């Protein structure tokens, strides 16, 4: 019995070490040739220009994309907390990739596959920043590995506040709108500072972003 246990322990240890080796090998292989994440420091998005009449009505809007940049200090906590709750509950605890979130999503997706439900993602907000700014939307393991590597690097170089600012100004929220400031005008015809909890529930639900 003891001999069998020792043999099993050796197999498990060998498998664990092999897995660690493969992970480090993949990170080393995909680390070369990645986009320069440092350019995020000088991010200047193309924003919309709006023309209003004397009575305050919108006359015209000129833009390639519906987008209004707003500093993180001007985004109310109710908006920030709604996105954190919906997208990345462990944002302030993880280093770019959330191991607990990945494990939880894997278990949940096994249930979803059995029940024929929609699969859940496990990308952190930092990973989404890496994808939206530096990578493509290609669905592949290669892209996910690059996304994870960039997420680690972004977390080392930028504050959580800056990462949130980038995310909340870049996220696509449907109807051609990018960022929370532009979407608040599109959906509610009011400033992002005027949004309440019920507004944010619509903001963070999948439906406004179905057209991604």
Task: Describe each PLM feature range.
Residues 71-125, 178-183, 188, 193-195:
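Flexible, acidic/glycine-enriched loop-and-adjacent beta/alpha segments
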Residues 30-80:
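Terminal hydrophobic membrane-targeting helix
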Residues 203-212:
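Single conserved hydrophobic/aromatic residue that forms the stacking wall/gate
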Residues 54-57, 64-67, 75-78, 86-89, ...:
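Solvent-exposed coil/turn segments that connect beta secondary-structure elements
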Residues 45-47, 66-68, 79-82, 98-101, ...:
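Envelope-exposed proteins and targeting segments
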Residues 118-181, 194:
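Amphipathic, coiled-coil-like alpha-helical scaffolding segments used for oligomerization/assembly
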Residues 21, 56, 83, 129, ...:
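Residue-level preference for non-acidic, small/hydrophobic
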Residues 1-52, 90-91:
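N-terminal type II signal-anchor transmembrane helix
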């Amino acid at each position: 019995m003891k001999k069998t246990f020792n043999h099993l322990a050796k197999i498990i240890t060998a498998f664990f070490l092999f897995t660690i080796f493969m992970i480090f090998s993949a990170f080393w292989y995909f680390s070369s040739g990645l986009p320069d994440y440092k350019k995020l420091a000088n991010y200047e998005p193309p924003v919309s220009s709006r023309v209003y009449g004397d009575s305050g009505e919108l006359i015209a809007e000129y833009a390639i994309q519906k987008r209004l940049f707003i500093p993180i200090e001007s985004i109310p906590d109710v908006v920030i907390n709604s996105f954190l709750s919906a997208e990345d509950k462990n944002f302030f605890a993880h280093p770019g990739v959330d191991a607990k979130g990945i494990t939880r999503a894997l278990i949940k997706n096994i249930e979803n596959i059995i029940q024929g439900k929609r699969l859940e993602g496990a990308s952190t907000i930092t990973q989404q920043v890496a994808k939206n700014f530096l990578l493509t939307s290609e669905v592949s393991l290669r892209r996910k590995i690059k996304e994870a590597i960039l997420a680690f690097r972004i977390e080392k170089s930028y504050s959580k506040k800056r990462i949130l600012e980038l995310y909340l100004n870049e996220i696509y929220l449907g109807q051609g709108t990018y960022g929370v400031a532009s979407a608040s005008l599109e959906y509610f015809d009011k400033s992002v500072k005027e949004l309440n909890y019920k507004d944010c529930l619509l903001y963070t639900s999948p439906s406004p972003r179905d057209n991604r």
